[in-house]
Amino acid sequence: MNLKNHFLVAMPSMKDPFFQRSVIYICEHDSDGTMGLRINEPVQISLKGMLDQIELDNPSPIIFPQTLSQPVLNGGPVSDDRGFVLHSNKDNYLSSIQVTDELSVTTSKDILATLGTEYQPYKYLVALGYSGWEGGQLEKELSENTWLTLEADPSVIFDTPIPDRWRKALQLLGINPANLSSEIGHA
């Protein structure tokens, strides 16, 4: 089972407080491991604040200042000092890795310089850090009923308010979060 372009949705039984009520978009999954971005936990800095700290040379005028007020997300505990941009495939950015026909992920600064300008991707989110698992580690967690999985829906990533993404992902599975138990078991 390849989980690339899927969501991991934390079950209420999740013991790790970092991942409780998390939704993680899986960018890469193979026998060597898994890499994803948590899409529903903001950090205490706006995109503009982060860009100001980086001091990018921005050759284009800012024409969409409202897009710079969006929060930066906490993508996960690995490399949490590094920015990751999940974006629609509008243009080719340096080092972008295509996840699907519609989405790519990059750590390249060239895309950051386009944010707020006419050259920005149609849809994007910025996260600090990523969530990672060694080969077989995620599969073990799945067998322990720690996560639910479903095919990713870009509307959850880009169009659903951040606090509602966990609930929305569960609803796509036909699950009412109020009906989930924090107890786990196997039949």
UniProtKB/Swiss-Prot annotation:
InterPro entries from the UniProt entry: AlgH-like (IPR003774)
Pfam family, one: DUF179
SUPFAM superfamilies tied to this protein: VC0467-like
Gene Ontology CC entries for this record: cytosol
Family the UniProt entry places it in: Belongs to the UPF0301 (AlgH) family.
Name of the protein described by the UniProt record: UPF0301 protein VF_0434
Source species: Aliivibrio fischeri (strain ATCC 700601 / ES114) (Vibrio fischeri)
Organism classification: Bacteria, Pseudomonadati, Pseudomonadota, Gammaproteobacteria, Vibrionales
